[in-house]
Amino acid sequence: MKYFLLLLTTLFLFTGCDEEAKTVIKDTPSFSELKKEKNENIFNLVTTEGKKISFEYSKDILTSKDLNGKIILINFFATWCPPCKEELPVFSKLTSKYPDNFEVVSILFKDPISKNDLADFMKKYNMNFPVTVGADNERVAQAFNNIQKIPESYLFAQDGVMIEKFIGPVDEETLENLIVKLKDQK
């Protein structure tokens, strides 16, 4: 009788574990699904100077070997956008003022401007920070909450955590206060 109960209990235990294991396996995404999801969050952008900027963006975290250790402002803009033009001097000023702590990456968004015209525009607005061009820009805009209106900017702390989202032109005082606060926390 003891052996029968022991056998029955053991059989019951293994049967329960087997069903649970099947459920866990069924509900767990496959390696290829996880890899695909990860690859969809990796962006390889090219600047007007041909430099590559790579980063991963997922769940309000920005990870990049290219941008590591700095406060990063990702800015979506277009040359035809008046509010975008309004904030460019702010970015240039703060990039010059905090070169070791702060970097702007401007992503050209829905702007069919030629390379020569873009170079002239950047010179006119004294853009001393990278501007990315190319096919991946649209994919980045989709990853950042499917951007539809510009300018739109995202500020990330040195550890890659998003600190602030700006819709419309960025206010210089607000941005500088955030940079100083983050820089001093380092």
What are these regions (language model features)?
Residues 1-53, 184-186:
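N-terminal targeting signals for export/organelle localization
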Residues 44-72:
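A short beta-strand-turn-helix
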Residues 68, 76-93:
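Conserved redox-active cysteine motifs that mediate thiol-disulfide chemistry
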Residues 68-70, 100, 127-128:
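Active-site acidic short loop of glycosyltransferases
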Residues 70-72, 76-80, 111, 149:
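Short pre-active-site segment immediately N-terminal to redox-active cysteine/selenocysteine motifs
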Residues 74, 105-107, 154:
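Conserved hydrophobic packing residues within short motifs/helices of P-loop NTPase cores
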Residues 85-125, 136-141:
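Structural microenvironment flanking redox-active thiols in thiol-disulfide oxidoreductases
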Residues 123-128, 134-181:
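Thiol/disulfide oxidoreductase modules built on the thioredoxin-like
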